[in-house]
Amino acid sequence: MQFTEFWPFILYAGMVLVLVALIVGFSYILGQRPRERATDEPFESGVVTVGFARLRFPAKFYLVAVLFVIFDMEAAFIFAWAVAFRETGWIGYGGALAFITILGVALIYEWRVGALDWQPKGRKHKKHR
């Protein structure tokens, strides 16, 4: 291999480095320097903020987010199976059925242990008569 094969890549890498240096340099030159008390407050379109801006999300939020990702991946796998349904035959059908069954059992388990329950633990559902 000769140098002439690599010069476009070297030129591209050099241009990227120059562009990054320019962006960082302009940011440093034009950026805000003095740290005031208002710098740490969230921007609310000129409206004075009320309350504490750094709220903690309950762990339930993250659990539901993880469950969403898991079951969203299930949908992607089922879609891929549906596209290749004719090529996979009965073996593919059995595999997809086992996959859906396992994830269905996992969903029922998560529901039973309360992973999808957003109510505080002290409250019970009131039945309307």
UniProtKB/Swiss-Prot annotation:
Superkingdom to which the source organism belongs: Bacteria
Principal place of residence: membrane
Sequence intervals crossing the membrane: 6-26, 63-83, 89-109
Record localization: Cell inner membrane
GO molecular function: NADH dehydrogenase (ubiquinone) activity; NADH:ubiquinone reductase (non-electrogenic) activity; quinone binding
Pfam families named among the record's database cross-references: Oxidored_q4
EC number: 7.1.1.-
Membrane topology: Multi-pass membrane protein
GO CC annotation: NADH dehydrogenase complex; plasma membrane
UniProt keywords, alphabetically: Cell inner membrane, Cell membrane, Membrane, NAD, Quinone, Translocase, Transmembrane, Transmembrane helix, Transport, Ubiquinone
InterPro entries per the UniProt record, alphabetical: NAD(P)H_OxRDtase_bac/plastid (IPR023043), NADH_UbQ/plastoQ_OxRdtase_su3 (IPR000440), NDAH_ubi_oxred_su3_sf (IPR038430)
Catalytic activity reported: a quinone + NADH + 5 H(+)(in) = a quinol + NAD(+) + 4 H(+)(out)
Record flagged with keyword Plastid: no
Protein role: NDH-1 shuttles electrons from NADH, via FMN and iron-sulfur (Fe-S) centers, to quinones in the respiratory chain. The immediate electron acceptor for the enzyme in this species is believed to be ubiquinone. Couples the redox reaction to proton translocation (for every two electrons transferred, four hydrogen ions are translocated across the cytoplasmic membrane), and thus conserves the redox energy in a proton gradient.
PANTHER family given in the database record: NADH-QUINONE OXIDOREDUCTASE SUBUNIT A, NADH-UBIQUINONE OXIDOREDUCTASE CHAIN 3
Family per similarity comment: Belongs to the complex I subunit 3 family.
Binding partners and assembly: NDH-1 is composed of 14 different subunits. Subunits NuoA, H, J, K, L, M, N constitute the membrane sector of the complex.
Matches recorded under HAMAP family: NDH1_NuoA
Protein's UniProt name: NADH-quinone oxidoreductase subunit A
Organism, scientific name: Nitrosococcus oceani (strain ATCC 19707 / BCRC 17464 / JCM 30415 / NCIMB 11848 / C-107)
